[in-house]
Each structure stands twice: as C-alpha cells, then as structure tokens.
C-alpha cells in the first residue's frame, strides 16, 4: 500500500536506509519501499504486548511542498483556507500563504506546514494513498543509516533532536 508523508510530520529521507527495500519499479520513484518488521513501540498495542509487527509499506522520500499542496487545494476547493470547515482546520491553516490558493514568492518548493490531520489525510486520499499509521511512522523514524532501530544510539538521538 502506498503511504504519503506530509510535512505536519518530519522528513525521513535520511533516516530510512536500514528499512528501505530496493524499488520494485511499480510505484513512484518519489517513494521509498519500507520493509516490514517487528519493533517495540513507545505505545504498546495492548497491555502486556511489547512487540508490534509492521507490514511493508511505501513512504514519500521528501516532504510535500507548498506547490504540491497548492495544486491540491485548487483541485479540491473545499480545502482552501477561505473555504475549509472550522471543524477540519484551525485559524492557522495555511495562514502564511499569499492567498487561499497561492503559497507566494520563494516558498513553492519548501515543505507545506500548518495543515491539519484532516487536510493531510484528504491530500493523501486525492493521490490514492493514505497517511502512515502511528506504528508505521514510529518504525520508519527509528531507523538510522546503520540500524533498523537506532533509538538507543546517542549519536542517532543527536541527529533527530
């Protein structure tokens, strides 16, 4: 299943190398194939259960840009900042953009920020994808260049703090 990373999270492109499988050519080259596996989550799935199993999935290699999200809001006007329901976005939603459909000068290729979970989910759905689950996100974020789970490595911790 394809999974798209939105920048209300963080970019993982440099942290995926231990989890990333060879690209099978069936999905966009903008996505990394993350191998499935098992790990201990900081949020156990059930009382007394420590290990979580993750099936393989795909994750965008780079954050969603303002230009990409602007294209989405032009195609899905209900997600424009001047039309979105307040239930789905707060008053900071895309507040730094020049207009309801244009990011403004110099920020088109920067990561989009100040989007809600609902808007991020709708963006993914429009692309035929979904947001990663908590466990998928945690699993991918725990990887370093040399370890599938580097959370106990002080050097890795310094790179993410």
Predicted regions, residues:
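Short glycine-aromatic motifs
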Residues: 26-31, 129
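Bacterial N-terminal signal peptides
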Residues: 7-15
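Mature N-terminal segment immediately following signal peptide/propeptide cleavage
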Residues: 30-38
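Positively charged n-region of N-terminal signal peptides that target proteins for export
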Residues: 1-4
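Short, polar loop/linker segments at the starts of domains and inter-domain junctions
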Residues: 41-56
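Short beta-strand segments in beta-sandwich/barrel cores
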Residues: 38-39, 129
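Active-site microenvironments of metalloenzymes and redox enzymes
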Residues: 56-155
């Amino acid at each position: 299943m394809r999974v798209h990373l939105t920048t209300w999270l963080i970019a993982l492109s440099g942290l995926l190398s231990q989890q990333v499988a060879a690209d099978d050519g069936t999905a966009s080259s903008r996505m990394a194939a993350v191998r499935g596996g098992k790990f201990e989550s900081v949020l156990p799935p059930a009382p007394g259960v420590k290990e979580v199993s993750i099936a393989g999935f795909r994750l965008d290699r780079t954050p969603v840009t303002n230009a990409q999200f602007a294209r989405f809001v032009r195609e899905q006007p209900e997600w424009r900042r001047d039309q979105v329901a307040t239930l789905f976005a707060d008053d900071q939603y895309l507040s730094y953009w020049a207009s309801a459909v244009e990011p403004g000068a110099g920020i088109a290729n920067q990561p989009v920020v100040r989007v809600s979970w609902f808007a991020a989910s709708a963006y993914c759905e429009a692309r035929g994808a979904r947001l990663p689950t908590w466990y998928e996100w945690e699993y991918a974020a725990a990887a370093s260049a040399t370890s599938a789970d580097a959370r106990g490595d002080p050097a890795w911790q310094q790179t993410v703090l």
